[in-house]
Amino acid sequence: MAEIKNYTLNFGPQHPAAHGVLRLVLELDGEVIQRADPHIGLLHRATEKLAESKTFIQSVPYMDRLDYVSMMVNEHGYVLAIEKLLGIEVPERAQYIRVLFDEITRVLNHLMWIGAHALDVGAMAVFLYAFREREDLMDVYEAVSGARMHAAYYRPGGVYRDLPDAMPQYKASKIRNEKALAKMNEARSGSVLDFIDDFFTRFPKCVDEYETLLTDNRIWKQRLVGIGVVSPERALQMGLTGPMLRGSGIAWDLRKKQPYEVYDRMDFDVPVGVNGDCYDRYLVRVEEMRQSIRIAKQCIEWLRKNPGPVMTDNHKVAPPSRVGMKTNMEDLIHHFKLFTEGFHVPEGEAYAAVEHPKGEFGIYLVSDGANKPYRLKIRAPGFAHLASLDEMARGHMIADAVTIIGTQDIVFGEIDR
């Protein structure tokens, strides 16, 4: 009788469903996965080491490039750690703006996830729908920071600037007639806050559209139900966080359990799954988008009523105003010193964690009293999730490995960092 042998297959790093640079070495028995060995490091850029040779403020843009789908939430963890060490108070308005943009980023992340996950599984349409909404939110990023993705908007002590009074508008071109232009600029006639408000008023309908396409879709359920099941106990043991943990039925959300900024004033629910499979994790993330709408609406309401400063008044940390810089020599010198030498952070260590769209994103910061971090450790949620891939994929088909990678919502910027 012929000897039965398992064969080994390389999945990625060029595979379209590998989400970037994932290389999986799969050991297969026929089409059934016996072992999945993820090989990481193909996107390693030594972020932690680079941060040691840059001033505290110069490392903010590095944070955007970790999980490059959830840019501002990465910055949030980093600036929180610096603020802990400095012991400075962030103005209330800046805290509300941060919470608002955390939720905008959460929606951006989940839109990317639902589009890519559905595309991997074979549902093309949702991808196009999701990117239609992402476009509007990217424009909000651009309005406040000047960049569509890598914003560097959060700064130690607050945010870069207050929300602008005008939303950038589409300009006339060869391909846009007056009628189309007027329709596109309809929601853009007011302030950025008006535009965000309008977006979150329209957005529940969009989420309903995604659910119409997927939630009760027979093929979608066949591909997701019962795949990649993780029990609550194993989820905790493997260090899963965020929707991966909540999908297994554990209501752990840092916004509720360890509130930072003004999350303790927000009224929202934490969605949890029942079965711990890919379908439950899908439902959790869709519901998270709906909860983000609730939080964003509360922030918008507060921001409309309460103007105020968006940066701390501690001049050792906060740069002078642009107007002051152009008229006052001292302000110019102060600005130059702040952006060349940077500020010195007291000796000590701090850990700050935020509820990132993918899980718990933590920054462990050690300062030796200099103007640069002595050590910066990044706790990326995706790292623990990828480590659990082997256990989740065992006994499933190759096609299911694609579903499991999609449900983990993996981005390699933060895993390889």
Swiss-Prot record:
<dbReference type="InterPro" id="IPR001135">
    <property type="entry name" value="NADH_Q_OxRdtase_suD"/>
</dbReference>
<comment type="subunit">
    <text>NDH-1 is composed of 14 different subunits. Subunits NuoB, C, D, E, F, and G constitute the peripheral sector of the complex.</text>
</comment>
<protein>
    <recommendedName>
        <fullName>NADH-quinone oxidoreductase subunit D</fullName>
        <ecNumber>7.1.1.-</ecNumber>
    </recommendedName>
</protein>
<keyword id="KW-0830">Ubiquinone</keyword>
<dbReference type="GO" id="GO:0050136">
    <property type="term" value="F:NADH:ubiquinone reductase (non-electrogenic) activity"/>
</dbReference>
<keyword id="KW-0472">Membrane</keyword>
<keyword id="KW-1278">Translocase</keyword>
<dbReference type="InterPro" id="IPR014029">
    <property type="entry name" value="NADH_UbQ_OxRdtase_49kDa_CS"/>
</dbReference>
<dbReference type="GO" id="GO:0051287">
    <property type="term" value="F:NAD binding"/>
</dbReference>
<comment type="similarity">
    <text>Belongs to the complex I 49 kDa subunit family.</text>
</comment>
<keyword id="KW-1003">Cell membrane</keyword>
<dbReference type="GO" id="GO:0005886">
    <property type="term" value="C:plasma membrane"/>
</dbReference>
<dbReference type="GO" id="GO:0048038">
    <property type="term" value="F:quinone binding"/>
</dbReference>
<keyword id="KW-0520">NAD</keyword>
<keyword id="KW-0997">Cell inner membrane</keyword>
<dbReference type="Pfam" id="PF00346">
    <property type="entry name" value="Complex1_49kDa"/>
</dbReference>
<keyword id="KW-0813">Transport</keyword>
<comment type="function">
    <text>NDH-1 shuttles electrons from NADH, via FMN and iron-sulfur (Fe-S) centers, to quinones in the respiratory chain. The immediate electron acceptor for the enzyme in this species is believed to be ubiquinone. Couples the redox reaction to proton translocation (for every two electrons transferred, four hydrogen ions are translocated across the cytoplasmic membrane), and thus conserves the redox energy in a proton gradient.</text>
</comment>
<dbReference type="InterPro" id="IPR022885">
    <property type="entry name" value="NDH1_su_D/H"/>
</dbReference>
<dbReference type="InterPro" id="IPR029014">
    <property type="entry name" value="NiFe-Hase_large"/>
</dbReference>
<keyword id="KW-0874">Quinone</keyword>
